[in-house]
């Protein structure tokens, strides 16, 4: 994923 630690809800809602 992009950033990984970033956990951007906008790009990765599944990570949030």
UniProtKB/Swiss-Prot annotation:
Please tell me whether the keyword Disulfide bond is annotated for this protein.
Answer: yes
Q: Does the keyword Lyase apply?
A: no
**What are the recorded GO MF terms, alphabetically?**
serine-type peptidase activity; toxin activity
**EC identifiers of the protein:** 3.4.21.-
Q: Which GO terms describe its biological process?
A: proteolysis
Q: Name the keywords, alphabetized.
A: Disulfide bond, Hemostasis impairing toxin, Hydrolase, Protease, Secreted, Serine protease, Toxin
Q: Where in the cell is it found?
A: Secreted
**What's an example GO cellular component term for this entry?**
extracellular region
Task: Just give the chief location class.
Answer: secreted
Q: In which tissues is it expressed?
A: Expressed by the venom gland.
This molecule's function is given as: Snake venom serine protease that may act in the hemostasis system of the prey.
The entry's family comment says: Belongs to the peptidase S1 family. Snake venom subfamily.
Which protein is depicted? Vipera russelli proteinase RVV-V homolog 1
């Amino acid at each position: 994923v992009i950033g990984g630690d970033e956990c951007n809800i906008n790009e990765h809602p599944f990570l949030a």
